[in-house]
């Protein structure tokens, strides 16, 4: 695990998760991004010429590595851990941390273990039966400044996954003007 990945994971572990109604959003644009119910990947793609993914981790993990919070949102079983950095025009915008229970990977139209450098949101939101719940947002102080984060449970064909996103300093979510 490289130093930046460690920094991002440590930041996510320090986020105080809140319900969207309980947080003061820094700007309407940030609120729109954090409360996005559709594909964040699609939203990001509209803000740049080239949206790319750097795959940091894509491996099956044991259930005992889940945090308490994660076990409250997902079944305690083996899961696929997918960690990525999503870039817009070669600028790091989002660190993504996704947990997909093994049972959620069965009978799906896609093989998530082979997702590779394709943004997960593009795959998930191309399915017919997708919904988001348990949306939480928060701030975290890092060496790179104060960063926003969100996590939510996505249901694809009635099977859950937990998606957590840390919005990096160069992300358009922090733009002063509407992008």
Curated annotation (Swiss-Prot):
Q: What is its main location?
A: cytoplasm
Keyword Cytoplasm assigned = yes
Q: In Gene Ontology terms, what is a biological process of this protein?
A: pyruvate biosynthetic process
**Which InterPro entries does the record cross-reference, listed alphabetically?**
Chorismate--pyruvate_lyase, Chorismate_lyase_/UTRA_dom_sf
What metabolic or biological pathway is this protein involved in? Answer: Cofactor biosynthesis; ubiquinone biosynthesis
What catalytic reaction does the record list? chorismate = 4-hydroxybenzoate + pyruvate
Task: Give the keywords, sorted.
Answer: Cytoplasm, Lyase, Pyruvate, Ubiquinone biosynthesis
EC code(s) of this entry: 4.1.3.40
Q: What is this protein called?
A: Probable chorismate pyruvate-lyase
State which gene encodes it: ubiC
Return the SUPFAM superfamilies for the record.
Answer: Chorismate lyase-like
List GO molecular-function terms, semicolon-separated.
chorismate lyase activity
List the record's Gene Ontology CC terms alphabetically. Answer: cytosol
**Which residues are substrate-binding?**
82, 120, 165
Please give the family membership noted in the entry. Belongs to the UbiC family.
| Compartment annotation | Cytoplasm
Q: What does this protein do?
A: Removes the pyruvyl group from chorismate, with concomitant aromatization of the ring, to provide 4-hydroxybenzoate (4HB) for the ubiquinone pathway.
Name the source's superkingdom.
Bacteria
